[in-house]
């Protein structure tokens, strides 16, 4: 079985079909508190975002913390990248960009912080794709990985309304306990893994849904938001993300 659940053609079509990609990355961007804690505690000077096109987190870390950042992906749409950089008052000189295959690339540079957000769940061998991150990481550096949680309500929404997208994800990778164990087996320290965030659901193909489906999904979203505001718990059923952090 091939390790990758997607290919370059999938991502080319994906990015060319997306609208509104060129926005100003805000200071309160998703996971901003967690990344600020890493910066405050570990004081990284350099970071690489793997599989992160169009580089929102590389941009975030550059803009708000002054890190020397690199974007690595096996597909980079140059027109989209330039538009996103311009929207954030940056140029191609501000963010290093490497277009390459993670499975046959040997990095010439190591980084204090290696992060990926929404990458590892697109591969069948979860431990192997985590190990690929470590080739970029300096000794003592921090690994930060996030992925969506499709094992709860949001996963039901994906299966019901966008099975094609659901099947592009390795659902078995969405297990914090297993992720933590893989990291320990790979020699990482200070490993933490868990569900993250208050309730949310989304659909990549929302614009294609019927009016009834959109209204139903909005109802689910509102009920979940109210419930987690009353009882602000992070759990497998309700949290939209999983976060993994460790040091080498």
Cite the ranges covered by each PLM segment.
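Short conserved AdoMet
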Residues: 62, 66, 124, 138
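Conserved N-terminal segment of class I S-adenosyl-L-methionine
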Residues: 1-109, 113, 117, 130, ...
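S-adenosyl-L-methionine-dependent methyltransferase catalytic module, highlighting the catalytic core
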Residues: 7-29, 74, 79, 88, ...
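A short His-aromatic
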Residues: 118-122
């Amino acid at each position: 079985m091939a390790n990758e659940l997607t290919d370059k053609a999938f991502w080319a079509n994906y990015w060319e079909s997306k609208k509104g990609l060129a926005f100003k990355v805000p200071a309160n961007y998703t996971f901003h508190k967690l990344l600020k804690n890493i910066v405050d505690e570990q004081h990284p000077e350099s970071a690489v975002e793997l599989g992160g096109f169009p580089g929102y987190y590389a941009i975030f870390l550059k803009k708000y913390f002054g890190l020397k950042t690199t974007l690595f992906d096996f597909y980079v749409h140059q027109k989209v990248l330039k538009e996103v950089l311009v929207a954030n008052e940056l140029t191609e000189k501000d963010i290093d960009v490497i277009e390459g295959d993670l499975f046959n690339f040997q990095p010439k540079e190591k980084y204090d912080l290696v992060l990926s957000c929404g990458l590892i769940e697109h591969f069948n061998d979860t431990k192997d794709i985590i190990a690929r991150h470590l080739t970029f990481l300096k000794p003592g550096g921090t690994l930060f990985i996030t992925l969506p949680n499709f094992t709860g309500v949001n996963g039901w929404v994906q299966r019901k309304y966008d099975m094609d997208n659901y099947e592009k994800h390795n659902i078995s990778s969405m297990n914090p306990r297993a992720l933590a164990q893989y990291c320990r087996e790979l020699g990482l320290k200070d490993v933490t893994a868990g569900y993250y965030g208050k309730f949310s659901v989304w659909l990549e193909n929302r614009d294609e849904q019927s009016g009834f489906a959109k209204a139903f999904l909005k109802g689910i979203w509102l009920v979940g938001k109210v419930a987690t505001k009353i009882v602000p718990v992070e759990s497998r059923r309700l949290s939209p993300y999983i976060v993994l952090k460790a040091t080498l």
